[in-house]
């Protein structure tokens, strides 16, 4: 368990780190914490990871994060424009770490991490592996 946590902490910076902490000179995560701390009645903050006018081939798959305080817990929602559903689920681990860091700064427990993917897809090269995973899943109402 400890090794997994250390790996997660090392991987959190990853490719989204600059967009979270230095998007055109703005630390968006710091902004979220400061906003929710200064105006707790607000109960929500959104950040975008896109830059207006950036080339289409440079757009990140993760486009936005929403932070909401509900029931004295911090709920985070991640919005992906596209995602390889076979290989990308491990990206949720660093997202949870972002949520835990923000909730810790706010002195709140973390609530659920919600993820929305607009265009889920599977690469053709992964089709056989995906089929074997799906074949191993039992039918919901099978006796």
Positions of the model-derived regions?
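Terminal, non-catalytic protein-protein interaction segments that mediate quaternary/complex assembly
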Residues: 1-143
């Amino acid at each position: 368990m400890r090794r997994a946590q250390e790996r997660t902490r090392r991987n959190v910076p990853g490719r989204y780190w600059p967009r979270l902490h230095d998007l055109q000179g703005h630390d968006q995560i710091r902004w979220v914490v400061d906003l929710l701390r200064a105006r707790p009645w607000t109960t929500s903050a959104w950040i975008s990871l896109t830059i207006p006018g950036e080339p289409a081939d440079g757009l990140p798959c993760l486009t936005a994060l929403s932070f909401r305080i509900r029931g004295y817990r911090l709920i985070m929602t991640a919005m992906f424009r596209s995602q390889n559903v076979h290989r990308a689920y491990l990206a949720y681990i660093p997202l949870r770490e972002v949520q835990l860091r923000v909730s810790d700064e706010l002195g709140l427990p973390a609530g659920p991490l919600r993820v929305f993917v607009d265009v889920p897809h599977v690469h053709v090269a992964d089709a056989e592996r995906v089929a074997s995973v799906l074949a191993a899943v039992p039918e919901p109402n099978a006796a």
